Design a protein with these regions (language model features):
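OB-fold/S1-family single-stranded nucleic acid-binding modules
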Residues: 58-77
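OB-fold (S1/OB) nucleic-acid-binding surfaces
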Residues: 17-32
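Structural detector for short beta-strands of small beta-barrel domains
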Residues: 1-18, 53, 75-77
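Flexible glycine-rich surface loops and low-complexity tracts that mediate binding to linear polymers
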Residues: 46-60
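Beta-strand/loop nucleic-acid-binding surfaces
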Residues: 29-41
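General beta-strand recognition
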Residues: 13, 21-23, 70
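A short, structured loop/turn motif at beta-sheet edges
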Residues: 41-47, 77
Length: 77
């Protein structure tokens, strides 16, 4: 795993705010906001995924659902 990266196991959710976007609700109870969205094949409600991501505390966003993450890799489970 790259330096500074974390692994997130969770469920893909569609959030119907600000025009709608896809997020990942982690098994830890935190909703993560992928900074560049999710690729089309992962845009499925309730899809279980594992992400390797970096927290991007240096960025702000309009979604306001949880921390912004830079997805380094994603796999459906």
């Amino acid at each position: 795993m790259p330096s500074g990266a974390i692994q997130i196991d969770g469920t893909v959710r569609y959030v119907a705010l600000e025009g709608g976007f896809w997020a990942v609700r982690g098994d830890d109870g935190v909703t993560y906001d992928p900074m560049n969205g999710l690729a089309a094949q992962y845009q499925r409600e309730n899809l279980r995924v594992t992400l390797v991501a970096k927290m991007r505390d240096d960025l702000g966003g309009v979604h306001m659902v949880g921390p912004i993450v830079e997805v380094l890799s994603i796999q459906a489970r």
